[in-house]
Amino acid sequence: MWSPIPGTLMRTSSLPAVIEASGNDDWKKRKEAQSLKRLEVKKKRIERRNSLACNTSKEAAGQSPKEMNANTDKLVSSDETIVSANESHSSGKHLVKGLPPKYQATITSEDSSSAMRKKPNSAFKGTAITEEQNSSSSVPSSGEAISSVTAPSLPLLSLVPITATLGSREDQSILGRAGARANGMGDVERRMMQEMPGVFTKGLSNGSRVEGFLYKYSKGEVRIVCICHGSFLTPSEFVEHAGAGKVDNPLRHIVVSATPNL
């Protein structure tokens, strides 16, 4: 027979409460350990990024001042050598402060010694201030000025005549090319005038005169370029173009001029 279902289900068996509590504790511990590991990994990544960024910034910030200091030291040393050379050149008359003038040096070798002659350039750039010497103690002697110019400063001064000679060579080459081009144009015009002499009409009934150039003159063909229109004409057409009409011998009325028609 069918029996009705009871309203509530009764639990027949279950795990002890101690076992369930211990399982929950283990699961919580595992989750905490995983979260701690993740946090440690994140911290390590952040520390690496920060350390790399700090190293790169330190290197960039450390190299640029060194390079700037090296460049400034080089500039100061070169300025000091040039100022000392300027003082020796002035022979105790003037004391120059500020930027030194440009020099053009020429090197001549005799036996095994070389002498340098320095000439100040007319275009003086900079803010140079000259002051009269009040006492002889303020101006160094010639021996001190010569000793102040060290061996590394000599190549800097030796570069000046090289650039000056290069500039003069370039100017000479440009002038030479321009002159050759002008001479070439003159030769071309002269040759064209020799190959294409000027002609004009003469002795026509109407007395008109038309000028032109003899473009082609060979045994079988003669062509004349009219100046007024620039058209290529035969001798008979050239005479007709002058307004004389048809003539028996047109070459008798065409004269070759000795001077070119310009």
UniProtKB/Swiss-Prot annotation:
Keyword Nucleus among record annotations: yes
Any Pfam family hit: TDBD
Region listing for Disordered, in residue ranges: 49-70
Main location: nucleus
Subcellular location: Nucleus
InterPro entries: Ninja_fam (IPR031307), NLS_NINJA_AFP-like (IPR032310), TDBD (IPR032308)
GO biological process: signal transduction
One term under GO cellular component: nucleus
Keywords attached to this entry: Nucleus
Similarity field: Belongs to the Ninja family.
Protein name (database record): Ninja-family protein 2
